[in-house]
From Swiss-Prot:
<dbReference type="GO" id="GO:0008615">
    <property type="term" value="P:pyridoxine biosynthetic process"/>
</dbReference>
<feature type="binding site">
    <location>
        <position position="102"/>
    </location>
    <ligand>
        <name>pyridoxal 5'-phosphate</name>
    </ligand>
</feature>
<dbReference type="InterPro" id="IPR015424">
    <property type="entry name" value="PyrdxlP-dep_Trfase"/>
</dbReference>
<protein>
    <recommendedName>
        <fullName>Phosphoserine aminotransferase</fullName>
        <ecNumber>2.6.1.52</ecNumber>
    </recommendedName>
</protein>
<feature type="binding site">
    <location>
        <begin position="76"/>
        <end position="77"/>
    </location>
    <ligand>
        <name>pyridoxal 5'-phosphate</name>
    </ligand>
</feature>
<comment type="function">
    <text>Catalyzes the reversible conversion of 3-phosphohydroxypyruvate to phosphoserine and of 3-hydroxy-2-oxo-4-phosphonooxybutanoate to phosphohydroxythreonine.</text>
</comment>
<keyword id="KW-0663">Pyridoxal phosphate</keyword>
<comment type="subunit">
    <text>Homodimer.</text>
</comment>
<feature type="modified residue" description="N6-(pyridoxal phosphate)lysine">
    <location>
        <position position="198"/>
    </location>
</feature>
<keyword id="KW-0664">Pyridoxine biosynthesis</keyword>
<feature type="binding site">
    <location>
        <position position="174"/>
    </location>
    <ligand>
        <name>pyridoxal 5'-phosphate</name>
    </ligand>
</feature>
<dbReference type="InterPro" id="IPR015422">
    <property type="entry name" value="PyrdxlP-dep_Trfase_small"/>
</dbReference>
<keyword id="KW-0032">Aminotransferase</keyword>
<feature type="binding site">
    <location>
        <position position="153"/>
    </location>
    <ligand>
        <name>pyridoxal 5'-phosphate</name>
    </ligand>
</feature>
<keyword id="KW-0808">Transferase</keyword>
<dbReference type="InterPro" id="IPR000192">
    <property type="entry name" value="Aminotrans_V_dom"/>
</dbReference>
<keyword id="KW-0718">Serine biosynthesis</keyword>
């Protein structure tokens, strides 16, 4: 079978070594004669899986001891509701920074539970899309927390600054598409959440990192399955968790550790992004309209000079083993998502194809 590279934004490519191990263990896990999908989440065998996964995740991100790690349902959209329901307390407003599609989606959901103070950070610089630096963000005095999305998958926009708004500001961030791709100073945040389907594992699992002093403030109307305190008190097993996704994510964590951890991912992700953006910038046939300071290393959108060639580009790239390059319906064009599991060889194959396509159709 020819090599296929999956550039999907999520569910995304998983490490080949992880898939092979899961395949080998699928019908007889740990010599039990059953699949890990079939065993009880409360049995000692799965409890060990869960504990190892949390331990490895904490180690990878150097999560401080005063933070809890929760393995949840609901995805990022579930957390759009969970954050205000858990963190507002007796306040009625929160600061939300709008830098793209997913930040706007979080704002829309938050309006059901509070009055968001929305700061539009989107700007245009020399004809390119950019984001205002954090020092220019206008925050309110009475907000329960500040929410932002460090990486916008659809827009290909990243906010790489580390927040430094003082100890009184609780920062909540949607790290769904950038978690584990580079080091994070977890201590600068009150809440970090991430859907698994991009850099962690398969869809169906969401991980929340929450500072323990923020627990116990949930709105009385908060569904129990979204209540951070209840999830923490029950070791993320208040109800049956997505056990297979949890197990696979644990394998990904071990793969990351075996391959140098987050620091190594940071380095290779920078290489991949520089290679792909270089191919775009050095061409008159392709273009990216995001300012260099805000370009995402995970999601690289690009347009062809003649969008009449889009369909042909997608057909030929798919035939060449380069899958899921179609841009999001909101922005069109192309998009290459190059998360941790995407090897450098995949990006090289893509840039080689782009150069060949340009020679033939430019």
């Amino acid at each position: 079978m020819a090599q296929v590279f999956n550039f999907s934004s999520g569910p995304a490519m998983l490490p080949a070594d992880v898939l092979k191990q899961a395949q080998q263990e699928l019908c007889d896990w740990n010599g039990l004669g059953t699949s890990v999908m079939e065993i009880s989440h409360r049995g000692k065998e799965f409890i060990k899986v869960a504990e190892e996964a949390e331990h490895d995740f904490r180690e990878l991100l150097n999560v401080p001891s005063n933070y809890k790690v929760l393995f949840c349902h609901g995805g990022g959209r579930g957390q759009f509701a969970a954050v205000p329901l858990n963190i507002l307390g007796d306040k009625t407003t929160a600061d939300y920074v709008d830098a793209g599609y997913w930040a706007a989606s979080a704002i829309k959901e938050a309006k059901k539970y509070c009055t968001p103070n929305v700061f539009d950070a989107k700007v245009t610089v020399d004809g390119l899309r950019a984001v205002k630096p954090m020092r220019e963000w206008q925050l309110s005095d009475n907000a329960a927390y500040l929410h932002y999305c460090p990486n916008e998958t659809i827009d290909g926009i990243a906010i790489d600054e580390t927040p430094d708004f003082g100890n009184e500001v609780v920062v909540a961030a949607d790290f769904s598409s950038t978690i584990l791709s580079r080091p994070i100073d977890v201590s600068r945040y009150g809440v970090i959440y991430a859907g698994a389907q991009k850099n962690i594992g398969p869809a169906g699992l969401t991980i929340v990192i929450v500072r323990e002093d923020l627990l116990g403030k949930a709105n009385i109307a908060c569904p129990s399955i979204l209540d951070y305190s209840i999830l923490n008190d029950n070791d993320s097993m208040f109800n049956t968790p997505p056990t297979f996704a949890w197990y696979l994510s644990g394998l990904v964590f071990k793969w990351l550790k075996a391959n140098g951890g987050v620091a190594a991912m940071d380095k290779i992700n920078q290489q991949k992004a520089e290679l792909l953006y270089g191919a775009i910038d050095n061409s008159d046939f392709y273009r990216n309209d995001v300012a260099k300071a805000n370009r995402s290393r995970m999601n690289v959108p690009f347009q062809l000079a003649d969008n009449a060639l889009d369909k042909l580009f997608l057909e030929e790239s798919f035939a060449a083993g380069l899958h899921a390059l179609k841009g999001h319906r909101v922005v069109g064009g192309m998009r290459a998502s190059i998360y941790n599991a995407m090897p450098l060889e995949g990006v090289i194959a893509l840039t080689d194809f782009m150069a060949d396509f340009e020679r033939r159709h430019g």
